[in-house]
Amino acid sequence: MSYHNPPIPWRELEGRISGRPAPHGHQESHADQVGYRHVRKPFDRHPVRPEGPVVPYAELHCHSSYSFLDGASNPEDLVIRAVELGLSGLALTDHDGLYGVVRMAEAAEACGLSTIIGSELSIGVPEPQNGVADPVGSHLLVLANGPEGYRRLAEALTDAYLVEGGRKGRPVHDLDHLAEVADGHWTVLTGCRKGAVRQGLVKGMLQAEAELRRLVDLFGIDNVLVELTDHRAPTDSRDNDLLAELASRHSLLTVATTAAHYAGAEQFELACALSAVRARRSLDEMDGWLPPGPVARLRSGAEMADLFSRHRDAVDNTVAVAERTAFHLKSVRPRLPDQKVPDGHTPISWLRHLVEEGRRACYGDDPVAKDRLATELDLIEDRGFAGYFLIVSDIVEFAQSQGILCQGRGSAAASAVCYVLGITVVDPVFYGLPFERFLSVLREEEPDIDVDFDARRREEVIQYVYAKYGRRNAAQVADVITYRPRSAVRDMAKALGYSQGQQDAWSRQMERRSVPPLPHDPDGPEIPDDVTTLAQQVMGLPRHLGIHSAGMVLTREPVGRICPIEPARMFGRTVLQWDKEDCAWMGLVKFDLLGLGMLSALSISFDLISQHCGRFWTLASIPRNEPGVYDMLCRGDSIGVFQVESRAQIGALPRLKPRCFYDLAVEIGLIRPGPVQGGAVHPYIRRRTGVEPVTYPHPLLEPVLERTLGIPLFQEQLMQMATTVGNCTAADADLLRRAMGSKRGVERIDSLRTKLFEGMAANGIDDDTAQGIYARIESFANFGFAESHALSFAGLVYTSAWIKLHYPAVFLAALLRSQPMGFYSSATLVADARRHGVVTRRPDVARSSVGADLELLDACCEELGSEELETGIDECLHDHDESEIGAFDPNRDDGDHRRDTHFAVRLGLSDVSGINIETATRIVEERERESFASLDDLARRVDLSGEEVEALALAGAFDDLVGSRRGALWQIGQINGVAPGQLDVQVVTQPPLLPEPTQMELLGDDLRATGISTADHPVRQVRDALNRRGVVQVDRLDGVETRRRIEVAGVVTHRQRPGTAGGVTFLNLEDETGLLNVIVTPGAWRHYRRVARTSRALVVRGILERGDEGVMSLQADRLEALDLSVPTKSRDFR
């Protein structure tokens, strides 16, 4: 469910979290509000057509921003402008693709505008043309004649990209092949100045006539139109007269076009800037290639009639062409592929068979489960969705057969069918999850089943899908990469001719969730107004096409006949030209095959435990309800633990004190932007801690809200509230949930509201109470989290916490091998593990694996068996009952849980910056054949570049082999020229007596080479100076009184400004003893912006705040840069 919540000021946010009322009458300034967040919403604009008669005209040649840097208006804006101009129709003809047609069709459907779909094809292009001021080759403008013409155009584009020689940015079109595919279903225009006919005019009428005759011979005389355009170039009028003469000679119609590249004159400067970006030149360098004014804008019929007064029939002809070619895009919606089932079965009968097998295994003879499954299957059969479930089940079954960890997430966990098929792991019958949250009788489209896979092995699953369904019937969904603040500022500064250094400096000042500052903004970064003006305009326009992280589309007919397919930059992948919203609007079924880093980490953990400790664990066999796991979480000790490791979650854990599995689901659902904005956090915590009694809006709602202490948190509770007190059906309740989360759901809400109030009255609920219940449902609808999703993730929270508690060395190695993932950098994970007694060692060519691994702490451990190597108490080896957990006692010593005490973590060779997995693998494989005798021995046997050898030396990977880092760096000059296989002849020179590096120098080398300090922390190196200043260590804050002004110093690990924080920025400071959350108000951020934004480490002065459970933070009033002389990195505004 999407959120449509407005930004709230900090004072109100703080009041909602703390429970204290905000100051009465205070109004926050605009500067306190959150910045930019791009969300595509349904088209909801209402342009007004001109009054009175208009000159009929349809624009047949128009480029949107989906011509990627060759159009300055989004398709929706072009539709709006076309309606306001009174056009009879609008064609979208972007370069070599149908990228923007769904957006245009959606907007046109809402506005009642007739639309034509086409594309301007690039002919004779030897390579991608970005970086070229005037791209080579010629253009062929194609309009699809109805649905069949559209399918053939999509097919032709797919062929051009997937044919041998075709690649991203360079389709290979062959005119003969295009004519064969078209087979009379296209209307071909001769094009603008890049059209072959108009280009032929440069060489004379004979050449132009030859090009025109060729088009007629290929596509047919009834399907070729001569295009007239006038961009006020000196030769345009003469060229149009000559083209009209050619058309008359060959009995062809002429059509007048604008060859538009933007909606209105106000986009002209932006269009020029985008052209400069595409050409990789400045605007000054583009002089001569750009038009003199806003000539490529949409024009009204009256303007076109005036412009083409000598060729008025060319204007009139456009309307008949539009009527002949226009169609509704949704008419080409495809169907799912047929799933093969055993002989004698249909898809639904086979699904029922599989479900019955799963029911016996999961539920036995439980009548409640049996009835629930029967209800779900009946609805699945009625909606014709059996094939969808079989496809997902088959993909999951393949992954499980290959040992790939996977599990479904989201609303699918509310389906008992998904549960017994093994797609999800949450029992919806046990938790009472309503199936209608996942699929209801009022839902027409297929349900949405998202499945998480081990991120390392997700590619195997994707390639299985390609292999099973074929490259023409399966493709990944696109991700349209749009301009964000940094790229907007960088590209516009580049177009305006500013230096590379200026571009970099200004773009770095932009934060991920901000917007480029308005011109003359005194509080904004120091960026020139001409840059910010254009950056504001370009925000949100598409920059290039990427690939969606998870979505795949499968169709019965070739999907390339619905949407063109092109190669992705990633090897072995192909991608559609549409994003997920486009696919959804068109009814293409998307299968989300997500890669989850935590599943990778858990899979690696199980492998490491098995390999080094001899113990075999799986997701299913991890003992449940272990008190020690919940005790660890109650202490807020959750760095690295799935979903509960952010500073907000760590701060909430000691207050919520989770003592059972469901508490973990509540933690996941509660600490979210929505519940904070909805005011649910503090009331729940007050009730959880016994400060406030648990009450219910009405006794009938106690069964619904009991599990969340009378506070609605989950979307499923909204539905259950509506069915319990309002006598709504479950389908009505789901419709109410979706309507309340949509700006377009007002009419639906009104009808359901009446039904809900009638039901409450029938249940004897008085009007005041009913109004209160409805207000609670209404305010909660915008922020509720899916309970099914929270429960799915809660299992991974528990499992990752269990491994962190019992096998912290294993957990660290697994997290390092699964990067990038999670909230923290590798350096912070290592520092946290060090505080838990885990020893981490540098990479070593003689000992390291490819990735992080375990090794015994000392040689004496090698004599121990696997049972002796496992340490710690044994209560983790069996399940516990929830009744055994009891209340959390922070003073209780519950024993040593660690079972991998004899092991250290050895960083992998691939952890060294500049050493990829392939290189690390070669080193390990060669070492396993025979140990390396010396550095030059390694250089001869492994094909390493000089940069790779230096990177390993800087990381200390040769220390044992050579003796020191400086000694290794000295030897590199002798071996860089030695190739693999050369004779063992070397010149030996005595290295100079080099001084030993200082600890700070070694620390700097570590951080530069791996980003990780294995033995020390940067702040420890300046601790003496900080102590003399009175700066307090994080681990000593317990002894500092609340509300005292103090100074704390540390490395900045994160900078965050959540959308719910009203402009407040949160910093995480890390010293050698721990982490502290720093709160920077908008005023303080403005005052110290440069220091706060750019400093790698800070000394922060502020007021120490302490929550009810001792959770501490520092409210900053002064920030000062701390020079550590070593490189550190932070994760900013993610």
Swiss-Prot record:
Which HAMAP family does this one have?
A: DNApol_error_prone
Q: What is this protein called?
A: Error-prone DNA polymerase
Its EC top class is transferase
Q: Which GO terms describe its biological process?
A: DNA repair; DNA replication
* Keyword flag DNA repair: yes
The protein's job, in short, is: DNA polymerase involved in damage-induced mutagenesis and translesion synthesis (TLS). It is not the major replicative DNA polymerase.
InterPro entries from the UniProt entry: DNA_pol3_alpha_NTPase_dom, DNA_pol3_finger, DnaE2, DnaE2/DnaE/PolC, DNAPol_HHH, NA-bd_OB_tRNA, PHP_dom, Pol/His_phosphatase_N
Instruction: Quote the catalytic activity from the record.
Output: DNA(n) + a 2'-deoxyribonucleoside 5'-triphosphate = DNA(n+1) + diphosphate
- State its Enzyme Commission number(s): 2.7.7.7
- Localization of this protein: Cytoplasm
Entry similarity comment: Belongs to the DNA polymerase type-C family. DnaE2 subfamily.
Q: What SMART domains is this protein classified in?
A: POLIIIAc
> Which residues lie within the region annotated Disordered?
1-33
Alphabetic keyword roster: Cytoplasm, DNA damage, DNA repair, DNA replication, DNA-directed DNA polymerase, Nucleotidyltransferase, Transferase
Q: One GO CC annotation, please?
A: cytoplasm
Q: Which NCBIfam families match?
A: polc (TIGR00594), PRK05672.1 (NF004225)
Q: Which gene encodes it?
A: dnaE2
A GO MF annotation of the entry reads: nucleic acid binding
Cleaved signal peptide residues: none
**Pfam families per UniProt:** DNA_pol3_alpha (PF07733), DNA_pol3_finger (PF17657), HHH_6 (PF14579), PHP (PF02811), tRNA_anti-codon (PF01336)
